[in-house]
Amino acid sequence: MAAPSPTKTTWKLQEIVAHGCSVSSVVLGRSSGRLVATGGDDCRVHLWSVNKPNCIMSLTGHTTPVESVRFNNSEELIVAGSQSGSLRIWDLEAAKILRTLMGHKANVSSLDFHPYGEFVASGSLDTNIKLWDVRRKGCVFRYKGHTQAVRCLRFSPDGKWLASASDDHSVKLWDLTAGKMMAELSEHKGPVNIIEFHPNEYLLASGSADRTVRFWDLEKFQLVGCTEGETIPVRAILFSNDGGCIFCGGKDSLRVYGWEPDQCFDTVPVGWGKVSDLAICNNQLIGVSSAQSNISSFVVDLTRVKMTGCAPQGPVPAEIPISQPAPTGTSLRRIYERPSTTCSKPNRVSPTSDDEEKESRAEIQNPEDYKEIFQPKNAISRTPPRNSEPFPAPPEDDISIVKEAVAPTPDVVTPATSNKKNTEQLQRPPVAASTPIVCQEPSPVPAPQSKPPVISAARNEPIGLKAADFLPAVKSSSPTEVVDDEAVSQIRKGHDTMCMVLTSRMRNLDTVRAVWSSGDIKTSIDSAVAINDLSVVVDLLNIINQKASLWKLDLCMTVLPQIEKMLQSKYESYVQTGCISLKLILQRFLPLITDILAAPPSVGVDISREERLSKCKLCYKQLRILSPLVKSKASQSGRYGSAFRELHLLMSGLE
């Protein structure tokens, strides 16, 4: 019987438990699209194949949670930054620590390798950007100019520029040769999370928390395009290989955009939640996402995705070359001039001292997969690399997930087995074979302490929202088969209850909206607080946070007690809104509050000053109440922890 033809556009490869605690960073290898690196709260970096459940290698050495991870272009080196501000670079082929770099005063929030030279750039919550020489083990230059955390760094394809994105709503371009800032791009209305250079032309794309992707001409340093329609902050973008379009990973969706003119070519539903990184290989787009301690990998068949103004042509036989569509942007834009190189493989750098090598180990968890990927047998260096085969698509009528394997964490000693029949081998450029240093099995570590549950917004199904929770308990002595009428009755009961919840929510929003339409923001917040519905307050703050000028001192008095409730909420969206609101209050009003409280009393009666002093005292008191809460949550990993640590730094002026 013939197998059904693969007709799916998107499918899930697998879901695995990557760490014994929260995953703080996930990144794909852009060269092969087959390697995944994860950093976690356990201070380790784990290497995975996107379609295999077993950990290939575990990299140790950091003493604080890992905040950011990045491969180099050839996927032979990997760098990881930690909460303490240190960087560690590993040689994956030699399975050794290469460098340990110290210098940042806060979390390392962004990393990137230079495309040609042996340099690494790092950005931090301390607002500084450092350029490191891997060979000399030192900082070459420090770039200062951002006022808030640096979230993303990218070298230009020719290696002459460095672009940085920050929470201060700006993108800055730095000239590496001159060591100074070339331009500042500041059209975004929210923190900038991700930036990508066009592979050929002088064009830069930036994704922001304002839910837009903006395109910048790097010859004139002007905005040439802006997308609309994203429902959540943009965190993952990637240009196509030919540069004709850009892929934007959103909440359970993939959008394909063009520019000049701005247009959305296609929208593809993908169940990846909030995607963390994207890569392209063999006309397939690979996406990875994380939720607490799990990571998931997904595939999108680009032959079935509309990437131009014309309709997609469907699957193309492997023997027929695929014609690439013409770029949508202007063809007159300047093109990068890449330096000529005689060898694509970088010179081998000597490892660090023996003491650092003992502290930082590369523990090979799966020797067979490690040899297949990093040390292929009978490899001849002058032989051109073979292309890896694309992942086979499941048939359309097969609704089961292709792979969903939960692997044991590498910290627990368990026998790792590999299934070669059902997995794809990773093909890499041939390198000289060498014998890896196989470290001993890691000793078991104690289980992490239980933490209060947090309902993440990056999920495929609602968590904690079950129809049974709204229905009365049914006593039954033995399980019986539910007939159709009973099932319909139960569904209707849950539906009625949910309608009541939504109707109440809409009624509350209508009440607040009536006050909001009069233009009185303070009264609107007061009415929302009086209703005693935190979700309505969150909705209002999401609007106010988009325009910082709406914030006033008397508004802070009302909002700060509500922020305390949001930071203690189990819903991620509530915590995120509370962090953003508290950050705006600290940045705009904390200096004013401290100055007014420290000022000597004036002579005579000044009613307006007395009112300001009273408001400042109330705000200061509430901020002091929030300070221990923020400090206790600053030890968390991931974007949560980064946000609370940044708030903790901003609140240092209270002490």
From Swiss-Prot:
Q: Where is the composition biased (Basic and acidic residues)?
A: 358-374
Where does the source fall among the domains of life?
Eukaryota
Question: Record keywords: Ribosomal protein included?
Answer: no
Which SMART domains does the UniProt record give? WD40
Gene Ontology BP annotations: cell division; microtubule depolymerization; microtubule severing
Query: One MF term from GO for this chain?
Result: microtubule binding
Under the heading SUPFAM superfamilies, the entry gives: WD40 repeat-like
Q: Which UniProt keywords apply?
A: Cell cycle, Cell division, Cytoplasm, Cytoskeleton, Microtubule, Mitosis, Repeat, WD repeat
What stretches pass through the bilayer?
A: none
One Gene Ontology CC term in the entry: spindle
Q: Where are the WD repeats?
A: 18-58, 61-100, 103-142, 145-184, 187-226, 229-269
The record's annotation in PROSITE patterns points to: WD_REPEATS_1, WD_REPEATS_2, WD_REPEATS_REGION
| Annotated spans, Disordered | 338-397, 411-431
UniProt feature, compositional bias: Polar residues = 339-352, 415-426
**Cellular compartments annotated:** Cytoplasm; Cytoplasm, Cytoskeleton, Microtubule organizing center, Centrosome; Cytoplasm, Cytoskeleton, Spindle pole; Cytoplasm, Cytoskeleton
Q: How does it assemble?
A: Interacts with katna1. This interaction enhances the microtubule binding and severing activity of katna1 and also targets this activity to the centrosome.
* Family under the similarity heading: Belongs to the WD repeat KATNB1 family.
Q: What is this protein called?
A: Katanin p80 WD40 repeat-containing subunit B1
Q: Which organism is it from?
A: Xenopus laevis (African clawed frog)
